Amino acid sequence: MKHTLNSQSSDMAGLYTLSLRMVIGWTYFSAFWRRLILENKLIPDEKGYIGEKFNHFLPNALGIKPVIEYLVTHPDVLQRSMMIFTIIEAIVGLFIILGLFTRLMSIGIFSLALGILLGSGWLGTTCLDEWQIGVLGVAGGFVMFLTGSGPYSLDHYFKKNNKKFTQKKWFQWLGSGNFPVSDPKGFVLAGSLIILGLTLFTNQYFHGGVWGTLHNKSVKPKLEISKISHQHSKLTFEVYRTEGADVYGSFLIGIHILDKNGKILKELDHKELAGIPKEDIQNHHVAKVKPGKHSLVIPLGAKADVTLNIDDIFQKNDIHSLKLIDVSGIEWIEKID
């Protein structure tokens, strides 16, 4: 009798989370649907390539930055990883919708959401959308692990038809049914507090959302200039965009080479920057710095060595610093070591 009551309770818990299961399942399955069925976004160097979106996560990712950096500097590995990642999202999302091996798939939801949170939780131009997707996915995955799926699921269908594997202990952990912990209160409380702690920590780390001053690294572009050197008729520097909106680039409309008094020794305007030869730009990542129609375009996460011709600067020893000017009016100046 007790087993029957427990079974009914677990079925009802799974029933109550049906809408959550369907919606979360679709959010992950739809990633596969968008990238491969509606459009093919897994082809490098084509518009909408998912690898470039992944590159946008790099500058301010938490804890997984070395992994992202390795992938975006190895395009072949990145493409394979994006394919595998998309297939995993499809399987996890579809199985969650169908209620098949629900608890195992909920671990997949938890893991995918955690990856989104750590990688892209800092993005969001008008609201904290990537962070919200991440923390809600983590919490939703945990809830579905606790409840399993109810009557409208393949797990329930297999149990109802007395399939042998549903009687195994592992099915309770990986499928659905009675939660295989005799007193789950401590487990639920501990898990919930850990997820709350993760939520508060990442909210503060990425956005200052718990105390102090709010900050949003997606509002305006930020460029880091380094490794400036000049030899004979060439000046080379490394530029790396670490902040700003991920949906469009920083548009450089001016570069000034200055002396120690701030006097302009050489100036490149937007037309000259739009005409920089591609061989003078050596990109490090899949998100590429490249000449645009009216400027030099620098996407979020892009890093490149840019070479300028300074043959027309006669007193090269006077070169002191480099200034980059964005179309928004923001300027960045870096001294030459």
Residue ranges and their predicted role:
Residues 1-60, 68-69, 76-85, 101-337:
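Extended, low-polarity transmembrane helix blocks
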Residues 88-90:
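Core segments of transmembrane alpha-helices
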Residues 92-101:
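Transmembrane alpha-helix interface/packing and boundary motifs in multi-pass membrane proteins
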